[in-house]
Regions:
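Oxidoreductase and adenylate-handling cofactor-binding alpha/beta cores
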Residues: 137-145
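Glycine-rich adenosine-cofactor-binding loop
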Residues: 4-17
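NAD(P)-binding Rossmann-fold cofactor-contacting core
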Residues: 23-49
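General beta-strand structural signal in soluble alpha/beta enzymes
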Residues: 98-99, 128-132
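Short glycine-/small-residue-rich Rossmann-like dinucleotide-binding loops
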Residues: 75-76
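Rossmann-fold NAD(P) dinucleotide-binding segment
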Residues: 60-70, 79-101
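Short acidic-hydrophobic, aromatic-tinged amphipathic segments that line or gate anion-handling sites
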Residues: 55-59
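Rossmann-fold NAD(P)-binding glycine/threonine-rich loop
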Residues: 81, 87, 92, 101-125
Length: 145
C-alpha cells in the first residue's frame, strides 16, 4: 500500500516536493491553495512534471475529505497564522508535516498553541511534525549556484 499525500500550499517548496514524491512513487491525491490563478490547474503540470489529473483546489474541506495518510503543508512560517490550517488538517484525521520554521520547535516559541495542536492530534489519533526549511539552502547550495 502506497502512502497517500495531500499538498497544502502550491508554492515553490511544495512544487519541488511534488516532483520528489512522484519520483519515489508516492501517491498524491489532492492539492490545496489559496484562491488565485493556480486554482483548477493540474498540480503535475504546474510542478513541471507530467499531467497528474490533480486539479488544485481552493476548497480545503473537499480535498481533506479524501483518503490520505499525510498533508504536507508549505504555506507560511508563523504558527499563529498557520494554526487554523493545521487544526483543520488534524481534525480531518490527517497527519501533518510542515516546513514552517516556527513549527520546528514550537514548544519554545508558542507553547500554548503547541499544546493545543498536540491535544488535537492525540484526540484524532494523528501527528503533526514541523521540520523547518533551514537546511534547504545548504543542502541545495550547489544546485542554486
Amino acid at each position: 500500500m502506497t502512502t497517500k499525500v495531500i499538498m497544502y500550499g502550491v508554492g515553490q517548496m511544495n512544487m519541488l516536493a511534488t516532483r520528489l514524491l512522484k519520483e519515489r512513487g508516492i501517491d498524491i491525491v489532492g492539492a490545496i491553495n489559496r484562491p488565485g490563478p493556480k486554482i483548477g490547474k493540474d498540480l503535475g503540470l504546474l510542478s513541471g512534471i507530467d499531467y497528474l489529473n490533480i486539479p488544485i483546489s481552493d476548497n480545503p474541506e473537499k480535498v481533506l475529505s479524501k483518503t490520505a495518510d499525510i498533508v504536507i503543508v508549505a504555506v507560511t512560517s508563523e504558527l499563529p497564522i498557520m494554526f487554523p490550517i493545521y487544526k483543520q488538517c488534524l481534525e480531518a484525521k490527517k497527519n501533518v508535516a510542515t516546513i514552517g520554521e516556527s513549527s520546528s520547535f514550537s514548544w519554545r516559541l508558542y507553547p500554548e498553541l503547541t499544546v493545543e495542536l498536540d491535544n488535537i492530534a492525540k484526540a484524532y489519533g494523528v501527528t503533526i511534525t514541523g521540520t523547518g526549511a533551514q537546511d534547504f539552502g545548504i543542502v541545495h547550495l550547489g544546485i542554486l549556484m
